């Protein structure tokens, strides 16, 4: 069963939160962080992207860079830009994107739950990335940024969240860049704290949605500190790391699409012909558009030329609407691809995934792309950027073809994690991303 605890959060005063908060460290590069921070000395980028405190070109892995993160964390606290709460408490973090709100509980997750598999993962981690995050946690002696967890829907917790959502939040702002609304509440009532702890204790598992390297680093540093402490009791703060936990049904996973530089020596005609072995290939020259319905409420469809449909409804009307369907853009034309029966196994939580089908039968078998992490011929485009970005990169000549996929579901992720298997690379794109700087967890 999952163990969580409240903690004394370190966070900005209400009037400074929009100056401090930032995007997470791993969604932008050093130049972008430098530009976004500008002359704002209160920006969290000075802690999570500390290479911006040095001359451009300074390696983010330079020992001075890590020390700069620690120095700035101390400076932020000394200047009152970050203050630690007096009481151990939970927090609620809500994000609203396109009119849909998801509510997360900010908790201290138990390091041992990660080590024993109560906290379940679905991605492999790289040791070099783990070590980078471990160095950052060590020098700051804190989890500066949270990990993103999912948990099975829970009516008791949902009622508690909705009760707080009806009250005035501690923070409430529209973030730059993403344009989404972010709200934050403090849960200091002892009864509510006890309820949250008790409800999590009933859950057999928690699931890492996003932040596998941060989770691994936090857990490894916690275990490291326990080993180094001769008076270790198991109650120390380093036995926990900061996570924002959302109900699984509330989470939005967007499509994570592929663009490829070449056709592995094939002509376009040869490539399309090769696809017919495992897919039904449809040249999309017209589109059935669902209208509002007739007088009896029965849906009506109108067949429209593809250019007219795109002009009226936008490119995203072409997105794959069901599992095992794909959208190909090649030589200025759109094609629908539908996996034939027998090309996937519904009983296999990995083999049934569209990311696996496309990787096996298109990228590997036809295009010779065997390692999605390292092959320079392929790149990935998060669904928030839309099909327009796929079209742009192909039309520009940078890429030869684009492949759009139906998004993975949270249930599929949980099924894979429960089976102990690992998702294929570049399979999930969660949106909105957690903002950093709203809350920090110190390890002492």
Where are these regions (language model features)?
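Surface-exposed, charge/polar-rich loops and edge strands
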Residues: 1-444
